[in-house]
Design a protein with these regions (language model features):
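Generic recognition of stable, solvent-exposed alpha-helical segments in well-folded globular domains
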Residues: 9, 73, 106, 177, ...
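Generic recognition of well-ordered alpha-helical segments
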Residues: 13, 77, 81, 181, ...
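Catalytic, metal-anchored helix/loop core of enzyme active sites in primary metabolism
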Residues: 25-27, 35-38, 54, 60-65, ...
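Substrate-binding/catalytic subdomain of NAD(P)-dependent oxidoreductase enzymes
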Residues: 51-148, 153-155
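Small/polar loops that bind or transfer phosphate-bearing groups
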Residues: 1-2, 170
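Rossmann-like NAD(P)H-binding beta-loop-alpha module
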Residues: 2-61, 65-73, 80
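Hydrophobic residues in alpha-helical segments
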Residues: 18, 41-42, 112, 190-193
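Short helix-capping/linker segments at secondary-structure and domain boundaries
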Residues: 44-47, 83-92, 188-195
């Protein structure tokens, strides 16, 4: 869980609760650091460098934030989720990835004028026997449930042929949500000691 959603138990949902569904779309805000930064840029009219320093001071961003702000972190997460959901291995190197380094306060103001906001989304969709994934900043309208996902929170939207639409929501940045997910993974591994787990 810690590798994908911070405090969101999305991997267990895909591996257990949704095994009867044929998943055809996963879209989400998978990086709490960049979501925090974009939220601050939107609400406080701050520039990129200012909010990055603030995120680092609060422990949300690493000393080297390249993987977060460049989109690589979200890219790796959508690769993992897509591989689990579709049953086919997806190399993260094959995913088009664009981060938030070029987003300016002017972009945020333009989005507001349109009644929208800018979010860094990771998305993948099944198309026939194959699937497509990408990570990039998107304009998100108020009708989308992702519009209201602010601050350090993450959200993953999943669409299945029987489930329909579902959204998983939780804290996605900071040491405590990640630590909680790591402990959960360790406990899960301990419960399955000496058990062979067959994967395709």
């Amino acid at each position: 869980e810690a590798s994908c959603g911070g405090g969101i138990p999305i991997i267990r949902a895909l591996n257990s609760s949704l095994t009867a569904d044929e998943i055809d779309e996963i879209t989400g805000i998978l990086n709490g650091t960049t979501n925090y930064m974009l939220y601050k840029m939107s609400t406080e009219n701050c520039d990129f460098d200012t909010v990055l320093k603030e995120a680092q001071a609060k422990g949300y961003a690493e000393a080297d934030p390249t993987a977060d702000v460049g989109g690589a972190d979200a890219c790796r997460k959508i690769a993992i989720l897509s591989s689990l959901a579709y049953g086919k291995f997806l190399k993260y190197e094959d995913i088009y990835t664009e981060g938030i380094t070029k987003i300016t306060p002017a972009d945020m103001e333009y989005a507001k004028e349109l009644g929208m906001t800018i979010k860094l989304l990771a998305t993948s969709r099944r198309i026939g026997d194959s699937f497509y994934a990408m990570v990039a900043p998107f304009l998100v309208g108020q009708s989308s449930p992702l519009y209201s996902v602010n601050d350090v929170f993450n959200a993953v939207f999943v669409h299945g042929n029987m489930l329909g639409d579902a959204m998983f929501y939780g804290s996605g940045a900071g040491k405590l949500p990640t630590a909680s997910a790591v402990v959960g993974d360790i406990v899960d591994a301990a419960k399955h000691l000496h058990v062979n787990i067959v994967t395709n």
